Amino acid sequence: MKRRKFIQSAGIFGVAPLLTTAMPASTIEDIPVNTTTRKLWLNYLQKLAEPVLTALAADLLKQKMPVEAKEPSLINDRAKYTHLEAFGRLLFGIAPWLQAEHTRENERQLQARYFKLAIKGIENATNPAAKDYMNWGDEGGQPLVDASFFAYGLIRCPKLWEALDSKIQQNVITALLKTRKIKPPENNWLLFAAMIEAFFITINHPFEMARIDYAIKQHQLWYKGDGIYGDGAEFHWDYYNSFVIHPYLYDVLKIAVTKDDAFEPIRKQTLTRSIRYSQILERLIGADGTYPIIGRSITYRTGAFHHLANMAYRQQLPKELNPAQVRCALTAVIKKVTDAKEMFDENGWLRIGVYGHQPSLAETYISTGSLYLCSAILLPLGLPETDLFWSTGDEDWSAKKVLKGSDLHADHAL
């Protein structure tokens, strides 16, 4: 019943009939579970994307998007950054789906609509004459973070870059180059600088390999064991290995190898560590879709499982994890989080919290735009329905299996 309720309530924007019209209760149970589940994921995508993309495409994002922060006194400062946060983070989560081929007709209609809105959004975000022109490095250090999410989105969806005319492409390059004057601190931020340079590699634009090389070398030094990196020299109990470190590090390496094969041994080693960390993340998902509320930036909600979603999307899950159980685990997380009231305001914008509206959970750097990192869980929508991730029947994930009395193999460190 919860799944049915979510499907009926989530698609509210009148874009694609199949996604916005509730299916008759008498027939919904006859539909293969994977098809129904994909619709649930698409409705979550639609809830996140619709207000951001439509407002930005109309050059009205700064006018329409509220700026919520932990405390009212922080709003003026966070307003300098929040719009690029919203766009960059949303884009990097939905990019594989925008790139995807072989989608069904009704899904393809929504995909085509959002692709066009994203193109117009990129134009406005990078055009200095537009009202929604964003802060790419003119003020503060935060733009480095979200310019990198934006660049990561273009890496994940090359069709977006290819669809831009030459003037807009140059605007994008100019915007991203502004971030080079921002000196990243000695932590995961090094990877933000590296990702932007990796994007330049993919478009055959002059790049600074030193930024890539330094980020990789430092993270090699910060590895703590059993698939976990320090966020800098120190270990922190949070989800930054998933939010940023593992996905960024591997994808930067994959691109860097095309220019210097000396990175290949590190790429292979990083993949082994990434596989292990995906096992850990899957085991953190409780039988009811809950997960430990620990560490900073917890209000990124479902973004805590960026890495697990990315490994599923890249089809690099460990052999011990069937794609179906990962799909079911991630679906349980989505359902649990979206079941809460007050996750969105009356106009469809995200509100601070994990389960509903909980502004005290935020750090001082969190604002409305920050929250759209939650879209990272949606990466597997880039896989076709015929992929094992979507095409196989439901399977319990580790926590659910254990609590049903199943006899699992013992978990081992790397």
Predicted features, each with a name:
Residues K5-S26:
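N-terminal export signals
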Residues F235-L350, A362-E385:
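Long, repeat-rich segments with strong aromatic
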Residues V52-K64, N106-L110, A118:
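Alpha-helical solenoid scaffolds in large eukaryotic transport, assembly, and signaling factors
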